[in-house]
Amino acid sequence: MGDILSRDTLYEAVREVLHGNQRKRRKFLETVELQISLKNYDPQKDKRFSGTVRLKSTPRPKFSVCVLGDQQHCDEAKAVDIPHMDIEALKKLNKNKKLVKKLAKKYDAFLASESLIKQIPRILGPGLNKAGKFPSLLTHNENMVAKVDEVKSTIKFQMKKVLCLAVAVGHVKMTDDELVYNIHLAVNFLVSLLKKNWQNVRALYIKSTMGKPQRLY
């Protein structure tokens, strides 16, 4: 981490976000977001970056993943209670934009068997892709539960036209250490994507859904 982000600052901010929030118990599980503002970056000219990093603890426990599976995958999913759909169920949506949109809204991410993944644009049209939820490949030599966990704990940095971005790095029921570890991973990964690394970072904050932002950098 170097001297750039001090451990003390990080723990202090995390404590404030996690425990400052105990005064008010919310009805839902608040997410903790890392907010990044950039500098010396021209989104028009500079390459827009994107990248994914896997965190140690799942930032969003309620994150839902649906398997678009062949027979074997659907049977496996059924056995471990993972939401799944087979090719017949997808065909029934009949490329109806509204229904595909509804499906994309219902789940946070999708996994698909090899035999299905190539057919998805043909069966469903561009809906999942438009929603930024095109399925990741699920092969038969991967453990489905482990793969779903991996999807749940992976976050994506995507530079758009503006100079600030935000990603979920945890939630308020985490321990200080879990959250610090996740933030540390996320920040280091993000900085590695930037052209001039830390020289492109104007400020970093963490913030729970309803809480006040705490500055890290």
From Swiss-Prot:
Could you list the residue ranges that cross the membrane? none
Q: Does the keyword Cell membrane apply?
A: no
Q: Which residues carry this modification: Phosphotyrosine?
A: Y11
Q: Molecular function terms in GO for this entry? A: RNA binding; structural constituent of ribosome
Q: Which Pfam families match?
A: Ribosomal_L1 (PF00687)
What keywords are assigned to this protein? Acetylation, Cytoplasm, Isopeptide bond, Phosphoprotein, Ribonucleoprotein, Ribosomal protein, Ubl conjugation
Cross-link Glycyl lysine isopeptide (Lys-Gly) (interchain with G-Cter in SUMO1): where in chain: K118
**Presence of the UniProt keyword Amino-acid biosynthesis in the record:** no
Q: Per its database record, what is this protein's job?
A: Component of the large ribosomal subunit. The ribosome is a large ribonucleoprotein complex responsible for the synthesis of proteins in the cell.
Q: What is the protein named?
A: Large ribosomal subunit protein uL1
Q: What organism does the record attribute this protein to? A: Oryctolagus cuniculus (Rabbit)
Q: Gene encoding this chain?
A: RPL10A
